[in-house]
UniProtKB/Swiss-Prot annotation:
GO biological process: translation
Keywords: Ribonucleoprotein, Ribosomal protein
Entry keyword annotation includes Ribosomal protein: yes
Region described as Disordered: 114-161
Pfam families cross-referenced by the UniProt entry: Ribosomal_S16
Designated name of the protein: Small ribosomal subunit protein bS16
Biological source species: Mycobacterium marinum (strain ATCC BAA-535 / M)
InterPro entries: Ribosomal_bS16 (IPR000307), Ribosomal_bS16_CS (IPR020592), Ribosomal_bS16_dom_sf (IPR023803)
């Protein structure tokens, strides 16, 4: 049985994503595969190429023939050079720089603000309804005291005149 290492297409219309699969040479492009050994996303920057090197070496050693696009990917990852015994087995794969964590970005922004907002809430918490009921009676008492004080103040002013 002739075995090929080929790409099977996934993804949307303008966003192709491929699996690197080992399949019988007679099967259609997206047909049944024997084993999936990697994935390739060409639209990402830099392109995502993940190949299980151990499985690729095995399939190449038992006679699986890579298609032209897969051969290029194997050369980029260095698996083809390793299989053939050529120099450059480390490959020339570009690696995406790791994203900084959101916590680190937040802490850096706080440090840059120097005395700006802290990690505490910026809005005061709302009082619960039970506290409002108790506070409402207290507010009514305080308002009554203010009215009495202003009434006494008016009486003293009229008495002085």
């Amino acid at each position: 049985m002739a075995v090929k290492i080929k790409l099977t297409r996934l993804g949307k219309i303008r966003n192709p994503q491929y699996r690197i699969a080992v399949a019988d040479a007679r099967t259609r492009r997206d047909g049944r595969s024997i084993e999936v050994i990697g994935r390739y996303h060409p639209k990402e920057e830099p392109s995502l190429i993940e190949i299980n090197s151990e499985r690729a070496q095995y399939w190449l050693s038992v006679g699986a023939q890579p298609t032209e696009p897969v051969l290029k990917l194997l050369k980029i990852t260095g698996d083809w050079q390793k299989f053939k015994g050529l120099p450059g087995a480390e490959g020339r794969l570009k690696v995406k720089p790791p994203k900084p964590s959101k916590l680190e970005l937040f802490n850096a922004a706080l440090a840059a603000a120097e005395g700006g907002p802290t990690t505490e809430a910026t809005k005061p918490k709302k009082k619960s309804p039970a506290k409002k009921a108790k506070g409402g009676e207290g507010d009514a008492d305080a308002a009554a005291e203010k009215v009495e004080a202003s009434a006494e103040g008016e009486q003293t002013e009229s008495a002085e005149s």
